[in-house]
Amino acid sequence: MSYPATNIRLLITHREADESTIILAEGLAALPDFEVYMTREGIASAVVERGVTYLPSPPITGKVNLSVCRLLRRYMRQYHFTHTYSPGSSGLSNALLAILFSTVKNIAYRGTGARIRRTDPTYYLGILNPRVHHIVCETEHVAAYLRSFFSPSKLTVATKPFSLPWADEALRSPIELPELQGKSLRLVMVANNRGRPFKGLHTLLEAMLLLRDDRIGLTLVGDYDEQERLFVQSSPIAPNILFLGERPEAMRYMAAADVYVLPSWRDASPRVVREAMSLSLPTIVSDIPGSRDLILPGETGLLAPAQDPEALAKAILWMLEHPDERRAMGRLGRERIARDFSPERYTEIFADLFRSLAV
């Protein structure tokens, strides 16, 4: 759909902009009909980087921060913004207060399907505020939940992007582990598991114990609870599992694997699955919202019911017994990242949305 050319002046309010938000800001700033501004802590005056104007701001914390609201209001008068985009809840509530009695359109972001309570007044400072013109949802699952609160026309699904060049360096220099040499199937899981049983590490370890197959090796990158290591240490599968702890170049360990496994009970939209797909790794993920929205079951990976070691073991065994098919899955996964999760596509979705709201 085409919209009339309009000079869109966009302010992005966020305490700590993540990589996806910066990519979005720079992508929009490169378009001829956009001027993009973003709040940033720790600078004394406005600076321009890659087309984005960064405006000094104190930390945007709390639902109502009067100093932030006054500053945003001053920026509104100075730069004549037409839209604000708020990827975080504090940025959203303070931006909504700042645009009172103005025609500025506010766009919010929702990355989780966590319950919204109509009886909780704090939600009306943010996502339930009637001055929120549109909501960008991280996944279709999030959008489906929000349809019980909002018209579908008020919702857009835009899953955060991943750029293939980010993975290419890891592919050029994978970290091979001598302990896994000779294994027919090298699994990898990258996650911060300590104090997070919902990441499903124990389910994966139980699946490995059910298999008891010396042809299969598992590398665990990230922190973990000590009882998980002790569980493995006292089992017959101990030689097949490596607890590496936190490592700065996790993708290089992933690049040396054959299959990525994420057995979470819950997850929003795990970036690590996109990383794995960009590395041409087939994936085994839990059949839960978020993870299952990223893969194409049977094409780029397999689904297994959450908290089901037997089903997970079956999926791992399938990967072991079908090496050609799993490699084809990996290639299709990388193609899916390039096609459906590119920064260019992500920017295009937002550009079309902002233009439509300017009409």
Language model features: what each stretch is:
Residues T13, E179-K199, L205-M208:
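Conserved donor-binding/catalytic core segment of Leloir-type glycosyltransferases
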Residues E19-E26, G195-L210, R274, E310:
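A conserved mid-protein helix/loop that constitutes part of the nucleotide-sugar donor-binding site
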Residues Y85-L92, R110:
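Short His-centered aromatic/hydrophobic patch
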Residues I107-C137, F149:
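A conserved, positively charged/aromatic
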Residues E246, W265:
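Aromatic "clamp/platform" in nucleotide-sugar-dependent glycosyltransferases that forms part
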Residues P282-V285, I295:
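Short hydrophobic beta-strand element within catalytic cores of glycosyltransferases
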Residues P297-G298, L302-P309, W318-D324:
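Conserved acidic donor-binding segment of nucleotide-sugar-dependent glycosyltransferases
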Residues A311, W318, E325-D340, Y346-D352:
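A short, well-ordered alpha-helix in the C-terminal region of glycosyltransferases
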